[in-house]
Every structure is written in structure tokens, then in C-alpha cells.
Curated annotation (Swiss-Prot):
Protein name: Tetraacyldisaccharide 4'-kinase
NCBIfam families: lpxK
EC numbers for this chain: 2.7.1.130
Binding sites annotated in the UniProt record for ATP: S48, A49, G50, G51, T52, G53, K54, T55
Keywords carried by this UniProt record: ATP-binding, Kinase, Lipid A biosynthesis, Lipid biosynthesis, Lipid metabolism, Nucleotide-binding, Transferase
SUPFAM superfamilies given in the database record: P-loop containing nucleoside triphosphate hydrolases
Gene: lpxK
Length: 350
């Protein structure tokens, strides 16, 4: 889709491209140091800004590690959080921060995986050092860096990059004109590419063929819609097929959310989307609640938004007595799951 502000944003995008190129050159020429952690490190990241299905893939990787007897720790920046510096979200026994303090995606992964250590830190090296010091007697088997492809200060044993099959090349435009965080050619730093959110297999195969020219293994996956979960007990159980809904969310790729709802047989008659990680307030939700009530619509949002709303206790209490649901999602591999498993095994058992 063409950006009407593109002519105005081109100079800023050109400047950003130059800064990114110089920074990467600094790492390649060893002008900037890369720190090697004493634990294996797996990085999961994007070359574009948001909307690639990274969080459910991170959840899959965490569960795979646990299934083979490895105990990972998750280290994230914690986008959208109100706290600063290094913060312990979960010590593997209890969750210590709410979604406002930890960030919505981090809270979601901590809740899904209550037995793992979860830390947030803007400076990932400080986060790793905190884990090493705090959990010296209960050291994790490896560190999973969430959203860290551009964070080159820490060396990694496996660098996974996720690409949205619906928008694989982002019109080759850098931020802020487009969605690219760095030039497409930099994907060659990756050890594995996951082509995700596939809805058209033929189109995905063509994209994968192009990506494989880099010599990097490519895995094909889709973000699969799961069950609809009520916010509270009063919402009740019901057959969701054919439900008339007002969808709302603050995510990077709302089109994918609408597609998932359609897969579930939900009729979306109205929707409202906010910026990714945008905080909720009563002023933002009240018009949605009023319109949904007027039209007799159920409210449906994403699991990530559910965790963001949990930090707003009054809003959550209100939504819990309404027909309000969140959609769970997961990653399902279409091709190459064994490649990812083999690469993870090499990191875990080397």
C-alpha cells in the first residue's frame, strides 16, 4: 500500500538507512564489540517493524526447549512497559510484574510458560549479566533473546529472522517511510529464516524460493487461530461459530487478526484498531463498548491485548462481565519444522 506521506518521509528514511549501514559496518569491522555470553544464545527477530507472528513462535521455541529437557530463560526489551532498566518478570516460580511493568508480549509469554525465568532489559547484555548473577545456583540452559536481530552487542549461536509472507519485502522502504528496520540484504546475517503467516501456499513457495537464494535455510509456517477465551466467568461458554463481533486490537498486523477471526467463523461487523503496544484507557474503550452494546455485538480482541488490559484493573473488571473474548494463537509449521528442531538441538546439546 502506498504511503501518501512517502515524499515527506524519504529524507528521514535515507538518513536512517545511512545510520543503520554505518552501525552494521562498525560491527563487521570490529569497531564495536560483540560480547559472548557464557551460555548458548538463540535470537528471534524481524527485519521489519512488527506483525510477523514473533510471539507465538517464541512460545513454540520455549516449549520445544522444555520438551527436550532444556530450561531456557527469556530476555526481552519489554516494549510498552512503564518500568526502566533490568526487571525480573518471572523467577520461574511466580510472576512478579504485571503487564504494565513488563510489557504485553513479555507478560503473555511469562503466563504461558510459568516455569521459566523471564527478564526485561533495554540493554540486553545487562539483562544476561543479571540472569547470571541472580540465578547462579539455578542456571538456565540457554538464553532466548526476543526481538534482537538488530541488537548485535551480544553474540548468538542461532539467529532466527521471521518474515511476514503477506508483506515479505515491505516495499523495500526503510523506517519511517516504510516498515524495514534495515535493508533487506542484511537478512544474510541470519542462520534461519521463518516465512510466517502464510495464507497462500503457492505464493509462499515462490517467496521461499527467492529467499533460499541467500543460502539460508527457510522454514514455512502459519499463525493458527486457537480457542476463544472469555475474559471472565460471567461471559459464559458458547458456540462461537457465527458470532457477531466488534473486533478491537493494538497490534502490528491487524489484517492477520481479522483473517483469523474469519477462519473461526466469526462475523466481524465492526472493528477498531490502535497502534502496536498502545496503552488502553476508558476513553478509548467506551465508544467501542457503547457501539457493541447498541448493535448487540460481542467484543473480541487478541491474547496480547488481553494481557495489556490485565494491567488496567478497572477496565478488565468491566470487560469481564460483558460478552468479551480473546483469541489464542499458535505457530503451525507447514514445511521445515525438523530443520528448526535440528538447529535448536545443535545449540542445546553442543
Amino acid at each position: 500500500m502506498s504511503n501518501p506521506l512517502s515524499p515527506l518521509l524519504k529524507p528521514a528514511a535515507a538518513l536512517y538507512r545511512t545510520v543503520v549501514r554505518m552501525r552494521n559496518l562498525g560491527f563487521e569491522k570490529k569497531l564495536f564489540k560483540t560480547w559472548k555470553a557464557p551460555l548458548p544464545v538463540v535470537s528471534i527477530g524481524n527485519i521489519s517493524a512488527g506483525g510477523t507472528g514473533k510471539t507465538p513462535l517464541a512460545d513454540w521455541i520455549i516449549n520445544y526447549c522444555l520438551s527436550v529437557g532444556s530450561e531456557p530463560a527469556l530476555l526481552s526489551r519489554g516494549y510498552g512497559r512503564t518500568t526502566k532498566g533490568v526487571q525480573l518478570v518471572s523467577d520461574g516460580q511466580r510472576i512478579l510484574l504485571d503487564s504494565r511493568e513488563a510489557g504485553d508480549e513479555t507478560s503473555m509469554l511469562a503466563a504461558r510458560n510459568p516455569g521459566i525465568i523471564v527478564v526485561v532489559a533495554e540493554k540486553r547484555k545487562e539483562g544476561v549479566e543479571f540472569i547470571l548473577k541472580r540465578f547462579g545456583t539455578r542456571m538456565p540452559s540457554l538464553i532466548i533473546l526476543d526481538d534482537a536481530f538488530q541488537h548485535r552487542q551480544i553474540a548468538r549461536d542461532l539467529d532466527i529472522v521471521i518474515i511476514n509472507a503477506a508483506e515479505p519485502y515491505c516495499n523495500a522502504r526503510m523506517l519511517p517511510e516504510g516498515r524495514l528496520r534495515e535493508p533487506l540484504g542484511n537478512i544474510r546475517r541470519a542462520g534461519l529464516i521463518v516465512l510466517n503467516k502464510i495464507t497462500d501456499r503457492n505464493a509462499a513457495d515462490a517467496i521461499a524460493c527467492d529467499l533460499k537464494k541467500t543460502g539460508i535455510p527457510v522454514v514455512l509456517a502459519k499463525t493458527e487461530a486457537g480457542e476463544l477465551v472469555p475474559f471472565g466467568e460471567d461471559a459464559g461458554e458458547r458456540n462461537m461459530n457465527g458470532i457477531r463481533a466488534f473486533a478491537f486490537a493494538g497490534i502490528g498486523s491487524p489484517e492477520g487478526f481479522l483473517g483469523s477471526l474469519k477462519e473461526k467463523g466469526i462475523q466481524v461487523e465492526a472493528h477498531r484498531f490502535f497502534r502496536d503496544h498502545e496503552p488502553y484507557s476508558g476513553d478509548k474503550l467506551l465508544p467501542i463498548l457503547l457501539e457493541a452494546e447498541k448493535k448487540g455485538l460481542s467484543l473480541v480482541t487478541t491474547e496480547k491485548d488481553y494481557f495489556r488490559l490485565l494491567g488496567e484493573h478497572e477496565l478488565t473488571a468491566t470487560l469481564s462481565v460483558l460478552p468479551c473474548y480473546y483469541l489464542k494463537i499458535s505457530t503451525r509449521f507447514l514445511e521445515g519444522e525438523e530443520i528448526l528442531a535440528s538447529m535448536l538441538n545443535k545449540v542445546i546439546f553442543s
